[in-house]
UniProtKB/Swiss-Prot annotation:
GO terms for molecular function: histidine ammonia-lyase activity. InterPro entries: Aromatic_Lyase, Fumarase/histidase_N, HutH, L-Aspartase-like, Phe/His_NH3-lyase_AS. It comes from Caulobacter sp. (strain K31). Keywords: Cytoplasm, Histidine metabolism, Lyase. It is an enzyme of class 4 (lyase). It is found in: Cytoplasm. One of its GO terms (biological process) is L-histidine catabolic process to glutamate and formate. The lineage of its organism: Bacteria, Pseudomonadati, Pseudomonadota, Alphaproteobacteria, Caulobacterales. The keyword Cytoplasm applies. Pathway: Amino-acid degradation; L-histidine degradation into L-glutamate; N-formimidoyl-L-glutamate from L-histidine: step 1/3. Its main location: cytoplasm. Coiled coil: none annotated. It catalyses: L-histidine = trans-urocanate + NH4(+). CDD domains: PAL-HAL. This is Histidine ammonia-lyase.
Amino acid sequence: MIEVVLNPGEVSLSDWKAVYRGAPARLNESAGPVIAQSAAAVERILAKGAPVYGINTGFGKLASVRIGDADLETLQRNIVLSHAAGTGAPSPVAVIRLMMALKLASLAQGASGVRPATTDLLEAMIVKGLTPVVPCQGSVGASGDLAPLAHMAATMIGVGEIFVEGQRLPAVQALMEAGLKPLTLGPKEGLALLNGTQFSTANALAALFDAERLFQSALVTGALATEAAKGSDTPFDPRIHTLRRQPGQIETAAALRALMAGSAIRDSHREGDTRVQDPYCLRCQPQVMGAALDILRQAAVTLSTEANGVSDNPLIFPDTDEALSGGNFHAEPVAFAADIIALAVCEIGSIAERRIAMLVDPACSGLPAFLTPKPGLNSGFMIPQVTAAALVSENKQKAYPASVDSIPTSANQEDHVSMAAHGARRLLAMVEAAEAVIGIELLAAVQGCDFHAPLASSPALESVRGLLRAQVPHLSDDRHFHPDMEAANALVRSGAVVAAASSVELPGVEG
């Protein structure tokens, strides 16, 4: 993989995606002097002797407690240890690696007051594949993602555990074996590592990247389902969508037309078809999927901005030697973005399930009942459709907005929170469930198209059919269905379905 060079404040979504997918990453060397200037400013601010939150005071409700100079290092160590209070299963390594890169890029903007030695260690851990074990639960998304980031910071001072090539090692051992040493934190550094929205943002970005692949896969399987049901491509006529002016809808309709272009199945019923209009699950794909695309893009803009911003507190301004307290740690923008991603993922799966239900119903599709040549003796796709319905219903429950569920913390000092971490963390599970639905639709749509032999679909869709049939044969009689579903899921999840249809350019979240 090509190395990603992080230019603080200017990292593209495609670069963040590459980091999430495992690309090596490092800071632009030009960031070094900026970081050093910020650390020097902290020393000058301390020399003035005035109380400054988080540098020589307590934290949260204890902000009024003044800390003496002799205890400043202990203060920073204590905040890391006391705040490493997360619970639950370890977060995915890919997500935490992205979180580390986000934190590194934020610190490198010179507004957090950390020393170059601190960013050097964090960068080295990313480069050497040392990923802290971070429990997935415990953040309310303000004041930042304190508990998750504390678990990251703890490993930097030799406490906690680190994943190294799949092994879970004590932090000190992992650092030493990689030729690294634990830090002694300086003034402000513990708070700077803990305070920020990087855990929430990493989870939301990871889901956004996976949701983009989900969206594109669903366009392909939706086109295949339209072919299987001998649906019309007339609803995808550009004149219809131009009049509405919704950009995602226009692009989605164009993609569906391109996916079906050159189909003998479609040409076989252009004339003499007594059906006037297809069901909404076919006909309204541009409207539903286009709306999903538009809000995924809206979320992408918000998350890209957040990923390139600084969400620490207080913020250090070296030009004036000021430390200003504010609320950039409040992750409301991330929470809102996560909520709309959840809506998009939910609806992508929902309309796909309706297409599956349509295909297995002979009254709607004109195909054999449950897509089996011998219905009754065989149950065919009866229960896979039930599984799809179950997954869609689970996602509907998870799509409830997290951002409206604030709860006071820290003795009411932190009395309104974003719940961004929960809102973002649920998304990967939602995408995984929706991918399973799309995998079932892939199986059902290809099975349905098989009944139209010797007629073929379009070149793009035939490529996808061939991809599936290389692993999963036509279902003539009932067999153990789970392996077929797992194979189809893997093709969706890996991006192979989208790659097989790559002769058609599919819209993505970056426009």
